[in-house]
Structures are given as structure tokens and as C-alpha cells.
């Protein structure tokens, strides 16, 4: 609830009348004193605010200070006015003295009074989504799940009273520090002493935080972040033993999630003070702040408490300066029952055991760090450990049964190697004495890179070799590589503000592939898999008119969560890869080493990176203004499509044009920011010329204008041109039809003349250009005719990913079978050649067999998805054998395909069998694919049953429920069911996932991306209107996507089916 209430027309009218009366009264009096109870505590104007030119506006200034005025009457002052003025001064002095005495008394006794009716217990925990302050102790009279009476959100409290009146509406001026998105900067935290006591039996905790703060500018307000915590007591003292600074009052301001402490005197600039806050709160049953999770072992449910503070949720666990720029040191102590252990960023320094079965762990002091990657956990887990060459102790904590099975051994092994790799690559040692990896059953994200205590959801770190596929091993590997990179990019060097979150997430995402190449050199991740898993995926998203720049302004608190999306992660990574390629990898590496060395333990912005990389280039004799080039890529949304046209009238000359690529031209004309846009990029276009037997050496052309002519050597009538070699650049390339025909001919005659990455890039560009209307619909389908001769995984993977959305656009059409048969025809030869894998898994041969096994898996998936009879028969046989023998002999790398195919083809008994196995298995990788297989059924009753079960947290983990709904939406038999379920349950889903990064946007996108009829578009728009403002960016993208689907079907589906009809007859 807003602190200043809602503004109605009657209130506005009253205010106008009140202001008129005030002006009249001021003409007759020399001064007046504010009637606001809160204003009485204000006293003098803040000197710092006046000095900075941000003085108080007249109405506010009149309410907080004595401000005599003269009138236009005779200059002599009436004796009665003088007498009244004198009396008012005396009265003001008396009231002030009384207030000071009372505040000192209140400072001594604190806020110990309980709310009426609570008998000294809790005064009411804040409700979900709210903010409140309540007195009492967290350890008394509270049971999990109780709902207590709640105080009004935003109440003002003083050091001696539970409440006072909040500032009036007229007092809400722009300068007020608590109304701003960013903290004022008047105060800077230097060190936190944080003492916590966790009561796991009733899921509450109490805390005391002592913050040493430096006053940068004089101020009478201490403003720091706090949300969903009950503040009991606040004290401020000067660092030099000058005694307490009297606290006039404090209040929570939920609009900006801050705690405001109003002082009776100004804090002096360039002095240090100590801020002490005593508070308590819930260990939430949600996924943010300090929350609880659980697991079952030997039939007993056990609980653990764990934190998730990024980006703005540390304030839910303790009052703090919760912005990345405010780095400080932390000393944490956690008191808990001795049956638990506690973890934090640093090692335990001492543990103090008490006779009552409690223990207090005191952790070593941290280096300078931001609040968002502070962390702690309280659990019953066990661990295994190893040590790096430099002496860093690495431990993996997990459920005792997982540790016994060795499920964490793989992660522990590669983490040790990765720390050593990054230390060598960055030439900056790992900064802490230890790194703990914590595997938890419930977490909002795959993992979180807390410094020294990285937290992972179990599915992204535990690996059981007996039931894990190569694909699962790759997923686990890349998540770990990502999080370990964050110990440097993000933790050691932190972005100044959230607009540049890509500075940490883009680098961590890019190094997923670099680091995995270090572990498995033959996998060629950065040169190959990066294309399909990052570049092609994010260009789909960034080709929408509703996209945004990778660096986007954060103007409101609600904007912070929005910057954490695939644009920041994947586009950030793609731009870093492009930068590394045109700089040269060795120069780029030296630049990163300098960047980390210069800014370690501090903050950096994108210009700091650009300047460091430009200097690295200069030292290598190259002069490129990196900032000038990269600002166009990071501050503009989208990306260009380069079109290369051969000029038949002038030998060896080509025309190169660039324009902003948008999938839906209609959306481009409707988007105001894109109308008449003059987006231009400086594009490092690499280019080669070739023919059937020869390819020229690579050349680079910097394209910076809308159109340019260039001379190309070796270009004749029989030669083709290929741009963006190996897709190192973040753009698409189109050609005239003649060049497309020459490239198709080259692929069919001898595809190996082009590199694997170039072949994959051509496939993706062709499908995307056709989807947007830049190319005839037959061109991409003609390109994939060569796949029957393709022996490499990457082009097949690119084709599979490109065909998937096209398949979903067509799968409910009457003549869908024509498309289906065409794809089966392209797959049949390779499927027959490769066959099915054997049922074995040997970790030692994973590295050697990766490319071949992933190719086989991709082709089997296509064959089964499009209805190859042999593939269906094989899957059914394997499932039936498992059911009859109760021995699972299905090859690990294709289990998900077999499970899904079997559920879709066979009867309800198979669904029930898979459902039973989902409940009984303890292997997290197996549990995941069993759950997803249940969504493949053709039985709508079973799909509806599964959707309803997905919201039961005891059956399906919160983070997995989204995947269930999305997978049902991808099933043509369940698309409308998932869409209806999503709308019916939206309030529940939004309450559960609304604050968690990615989750809402992932859900909205997954449920709507394949809607493609006018009726579904209308339903989406109407639904969006009914929840105006909620997840608006995600819904806007969804509407644009569905509009593009509808538009494509209207304009191009007939053209596609006509060509397919002719192709199948020949």
C-alpha cells in the first residue's frame, strides 16, 4: 500500500482550497509552524541539500522550519505579532527539549512493546509481496504457516513507539532520498557485522546488523534497503565515541523497499558512524531472499535454509545498502541448532557450542564485495573435497545419499581444473581461501555465483554416471564453467549498475564455451556449438521489434529484473565473441587480464572495458576505437542484415548494404522507435570467394554505411561469395538469388569445401531470412537437401533447430503431412547409416565419441519426431522390454527420445508406468526426463491431469512446473489445454514466479510462442489487457511473436506447400 495513499478528485480539490488559505494566512503572519506530527521532527533544512542546489520547494520548506516573511504593508511590525512570535519560539524550544529527552529515553529502552493482542509474541509477519515492521521475538509463539495480525505497510516507527504518522502527501517531494530508485550516495557502508539466529523448527530468524558507515555529505536521514523484515530497534552512534546520535524515528517505505531513519541532528560529512539494527523475519517458503527448501531421506522430510540475493533480494534478509556499487567487508555469525551446519562466503573461523544444543559459527571477514553475492546456508548436508594447485579448498555439499553415490564427484573434479584454468587465463589468482558448491533441491535458477559459496539446483550439478547422458553431462559442465567464471567476472569485478549486467553475464556465458573447450578440446564448443546454442537462439529474440539494447537504462526498481534476460546473457556473449575475433584472441586475452587487474575488488562500467581493450590493441600496433564500434552494438537494439549483391556491369565489384533485421515488417512500422530509424552499425564483415574446388583467403571489410561498393578479387561468373565466415559476427547475410543458387549447388556437389560452421550458418540464415520475407520459402528447404551427405553434428543441429518452429507453425494444418514427408525424406538416409547406439556408458570415451553420438541422437530425434516407422517401432520395443523385465536397457543418450515416443504411441498403462518411475527414482537427471516424457501423451485427459498436478509442490518442484506447462504447450494435442490452463491459473503462477528472474518470461514465451491463429491472437491480446502492466514486456514480445506467426501463415504458407507439392512429385 502506498505510503501517501491514493489521490482522488475530492482530495485534489481539498488541497487546492487548503493552499489558498495558507497563502492568505502567510500574508497576515510572519511565520507558521507545520501541523504535521512527522514534520515536527525535521528541524532545520538539510545543509547538504541546499548546498547542492536541490533546496526544498516552498510548500515543503514552510512545513519544516521557521521562515519569517514581510508583507507589502508598513515596515513596522505590530507589537502583538512580535509577542506572538516570541511565544511561539519559546514553545518550540520547550517541545524540542522534551522530544530530545524522550528520544534518549527511547534509545535506552528500545521498541520492546508488543502489538496489542500478541502477548509479547510476533506482531504479525509481512504478507507476501508486502513490507511491514513488527515487534517481538522470532523465537517465541510462532508456528510455521500461522497468519498473524499485520501492521499497515509503510508505518513510521520511532525508537520508543511502535508507530507514528507517515509523511503527508504534500511532503512527498522529489528530493526526498527515500523516494528515489537509487540511494543518494550521502552514506557509504564500509563494514557489516551481521549476527543471525535461525529457528528452523518454525522457519523464522532474528538478526542484528551493525554497519560502519562513512558520511560523504551531511544528512539527517539514514536510508538503506529493507523489505519484508520487522525492524525492532535502530541506534546510531558516532565512531569516535562521541555517544549516540538521537533517532527521531524510522519507517519502512515499501515503494522503494527502503528503511528510513530520521535523526534529530545532522550527520557530519567526512565522519564515520555506526548503525545498529535489530530485526526479525521469516525463512520464506518462496525462492528469493532467505528461503527454505526440503528433501526426503529414509522417509523423513528434512529442511534447509538457503539464500538467493541477486539482484535485489539481500534486503529481504537484512537491512543493507543493496546496490552493486556499495562494496563493503562482511563479518557473519550464524547461530543454529547443533544438528545443522552453516555455510557462508568465507570459512568458519571459530564455532562456539552451547549447552542447550545450539552452536554459533563465526566466519572470517570477506574482502570488499557487493551485497547481491553474499550468501549463507543452514543444512544437514555432507561433503567431499579437493584442493587446487594454489591451495584453494573446494568442497561439494549435497544430500547425504547423493554424496554416498558419488553424484557430486564429477562437479568437484572439473571445478578444481577450472579454477586452475581461469587463474592461468586471467593471470589473477582466485581471491578466497575456499570455494563451496552447494546442491539444493529447490532454487529459482540453475545456479548462483555467490563468492566462495556457489549454489546450484541439483539438476545442474549432480551427475550419476549410470543414468546420465552425454547431453546431461554437457549441461552440468557448462553451468559449472559459467559459475566459476563469475568468481572473476561479477564477484571480483562487479558492474557499477544493473544496466551493464551483461558485463558479467555475457562474459560468463561466453566462457561456458571457452572453459568447456579447455576440459574437452575436441568438442570445439566455441567455434561450433556456440552458433546453435547462443547465436542462432538469441538472434530469434533480438529480431523482434520489441527487443531492447544489451545495455538498457534502469529507471525504475521494476526495471532491474527486466535486464536479466537472454539479450544480456546470449547477445552479450555473442558480442564478446565478435570482439575477440576481430581483435585477435591473444590481444583480447591480454586486455581482459588488464581489466581484471585494474578493477579487482571494485566496480567497472562498459567504458572501462572498452578503454582497456583499446589500450591492448594500441600496444599491438592497431588503432581501433573500441568504444565507438561497440557502443553501436550495445546501445542500439537488434542487429543488421548485410546484403551482398554481385554487380554484373562492373567486373569484381559488389554492392554491400545494411539494414535493421526485423522478423515482422508490420511490427516495425507500428513501433514508434523504429519508424524512419537510421540504425547503423560498424560491421566487421569477413568475406571469401570460392568455386567448386577452391576458396580464397579470408578478407575483412568494415561496413559502416547503408550501402557501399567494394572491389573483390577472384570474382567471376561461376564464383560464389560467402560473408561472415564461421559466423563470428552478430549479423545475418543475404545474397542475390544467383549467389544462393551457387551456394546450394556447392553444398550438393561438395559441401566440405565450406567449413562446418559456415554450413550451419548458411542453414540458419536461410530459414530466418525466409521467415522474415527476405527470401523465397523454398531456398532453406532446398539447402537442407544436401544433409543426406552431411556427417557432422553442427549442420544437423542447426537444421533441427530451424525446422522446429516451422514444424510448430504447420503441425495443425490439414496438409501438414506433405511437410512431414519432405523432412523424413531428408533424414532417412542418415538415420539408416547411423542406426541406434548400444546401451553402454564409459566416461573415458565421452570426449572421443561426443560429436558422433550427438549426431546420432539428433537424427534419431528428427526421425522419431516426424514419424519414421522404424524409429517408432524401436522406441516402443525398448519401452515394452523395460516394463516387462523391469530392467532399463534403453541407451542413455536417447532415453528422453524413447520415453517421449513411447508415451505418445502406447496406452495409458505406459503413462502410469513412467509416472511411477518418476516418483521412485532418486537420480535427478532421470527424474527430469521422466517428467518431461509425461507431457508427450496424445491423451488430453492425461495432459490435463498432469497440468493440474504440476502446481502441487509436493509432487513437482516449483522450478519444474514451468517446464511441464511449456512442454504440454509444445505438444499439438495439448497446446490449447496449456494455453487455457495458463490463463486460468495466471494469478497463482504470477504470485509464485513473478519476482524470479526469467521464470515469468520463460513461462509466457513457452506457452504462447506457437499460437498462430487469429482467434488465439485475439485471446492473447484480451488476456494481456485484463492484466495491464503485469509482465508487460514479456506479453508484448508474446503478442509480436504471435502476430508474426499469423502474418507468416497468411503470406507464405501457400507458397511453401505449393513448392513442397512439386518437390515431392519429382
From Swiss-Prot:
Residues 1-81 are cytoplasmic. Zn(2+) binds at residues 482, 486, 505. The modification Phosphothreonine is found at residue 71. Specific inactivation of TRH after its release. Residues 1-14, 143-154 have a biased composition (Basic and acidic residues). This is Thyrotropin-releasing hormone-degrading ectoenzyme. Keywords: Aminopeptidase, Disulfide bond, Glycoprotein, Hydrolase, Membrane, Metal-binding, Metalloprotease, Phosphoprotein, Protease, Signal-anchor, Transmembrane, Transmembrane helix, Zinc. One of its GO terms (cellular component) is cytoplasm. The active site is at residue 483. Substrate binds at residues 446-450. CDD domains: M1_APN-Q_like. Residues 118-127 have a biased composition (Gly residues). Pfam families: ERAP1_C (PF11838), Peptidase_M1 (PF01433), Peptidase_M1_N (PF17900). Glycans are attached at residues 131, 202, 217, 264, 380, 647, 676, 691, 705, 726, 842, 948. GO terms for molecular function: aminopeptidase activity; metalloaminopeptidase activity; peptide binding; pyroglutamyl-peptidase activity; zinc ion binding. Its EC number is 3.4.19.6. The record marks 569 as: Transition state stabilizer. It comes from the Eukaryota. Belongs to the peptidase M1 family. It catalyses: Release of the N-terminal pyroglutamyl group from pGlu-|-His-Xaa tripeptides and pGlu-|-His-Xaa-Gly tetrapeptides. Residues 103-1066 are extracellular. It is found in: Membrane. GO terms for biological process: peptide catabolic process; proteolysis. It comes from Rattus norvegicus (Rat).
